């Protein structure tokens, strides 16, 4: 009889928990069902790697999954649920990229930013690394998970569970873990204490060292559907249905991008200004040594903005060129870019982006992203890119 009552109680707890945080997540039904089913069946890998692009919901799902694990084995599931909802459960731990700022002058670790982290997750659960660094006032720096953080993780997980159940460590943007930190955590991830669960979240699994990756069970998240994004914009952001559908087609499966498009993120206006200044100078630079100085000044300006901003800008440039290509090849229904700069007409620019130069342009932009990500000299990288762009834009398309 006691066993039957226990089973009945557990089923009620599971139903209650499943109806809470998981139902706030956009789409990803297959992922949610897989995680819940494996947990109910007692198949809970001790180290899991959630792999998904920005805005796909990896962090919200990791938190919801942690909530399920922690509340499922609690004597008071409602209280446990509430604590996880506030990100204040004593058995839920976080590690994420940080760096020094005005408040934290040295040895930055996640614990010193927990208040800001809770606000960030509450307000931007689908937010990017760039958004996070903006929120702590360091968008001009690169966040990192360093060896000090790794030591903190080890220290936290050596302690017994406060509530006698699981301990969950969520490592967000795990690709930002440097080699020293990864090596410190290697043995712990391979052989964690009993009832300790690691949830590593990444947008780029190739940047995580293989010895860490091989010790985790990988779970790949697809991008969100346009329908899921549109429905969520209507429900969460009070968007009209027509506007939500338009933005959903632009968002490329990224809910974070959709929200910023809806609210017309001011970064895009700055990026548009930088891009058009760059393009105009690149057009004039061929055979005009005086204009080369304009490209040097432009490169210096962007180089001062910080690496995360530079990476965001280069991604914006990729999108701009692709939109121009679509317009050039008579697919205006796929073009969503709305230019705010006076006297710049995308229709007039589009013919300069074509089959003979688009692959080279994309390659050089991606190469620049790669080198900036790896701490290359931004001024030199951007100036080199500018010189190449000057050649590409003057390349003629072959006529048949």
Whereabouts are the PLM-identified features?
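Short, positively charged and aromatic/hydrophobic N-terminal segments
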Residues: 5, 9-16
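Residues immediately C-terminal
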Residues: 176, 191, 207
